[in-house]
Amino acid sequence: MHRSPLIRACLAGAAALGAGVAVAAPAQAATPAAPGTTGDHGWVSTGDGMTSGVSGMVVTGRHGGEIDALVVRDNKKAGENRLARVSYRPGRQADVRPLGWQGSSTPVDLESIEKVPGHEGEYIAVASEGKGYRFQVGHGAAHVRETFTLPDIGEGDNFEDFALTYRHGKLAAVWADRGQDERPSTLYAARISLPEHGAADFGAVTEQELRAPYPTENVRHASDLKITDSGSLLVGSASDPGDDGPFDSAVYEAGTVSPDRSHGVSLHVAKDPEVLGKFAGHKIEALACLPGSREGVLGTDDENAGGALNTARFCER
């Protein structure tokens, strides 16, 4: 797969966000950055403070210049938002509408969200401990239909990644412990069955270690993960020295995944992962590709500085 790591990005001052209030940035055109560097424009706030970050995201629609998405937040206390609907105009504003949570106990530390292929309007969110929530959204809330636990959880695993891919008539899942500094991320992959009526069922699990090519200090090797239509693994990585930063991030192509012809999954990790973009000053924890485009959306959890969204070219057509 050939893609330019040319990044389009923009800077916006943070703006206060109340529930369902649009947060705007100055309207300005995104300007290209040199390959491998960070543009300093276009970031749009999703709110101020620790509870307003974005820890996972899926795009649900696109209407002209506006992108619709669902985002999860890694909040832990009662009364704090876990899931929100976002209408986002790149470089201009984000309208964030918190959603409720029904059908299960309120999750703690949601870190990823993914669409369920073949089940319109259905999603899976996964918390850092490895608990998954299969749900639909309606009437201002998530309605949980099933919970499950990821298989083969290793000691010390802290999950920030969960993605699904449907290829050759077979469904597979990839999830990952984030890793930390000298401890690499562990990628897990397995076939998965998600019947209309019944529980999630995982097949045999394949594991591979993964180290981010960038950043190199205080690094989480896998802060989010998405799978392209061709099976490429797009991974975010982040430097997190503490709640006040300074943060640094990258998006890189880590390898490939595909259900194999038997009952397993072929998981390949690149020897030298390709950095597709670097993003200084932000802690990227969410990736989402736009359908039919090389552009994707980045979401950040910048802790005390809140959260932000931006677009960049890191996807394949």
Describe each model-derived feature in a short phrase.
Residues 2-8, 13, 20, 26-317:
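Sequence/structural signature of beta-propeller domains
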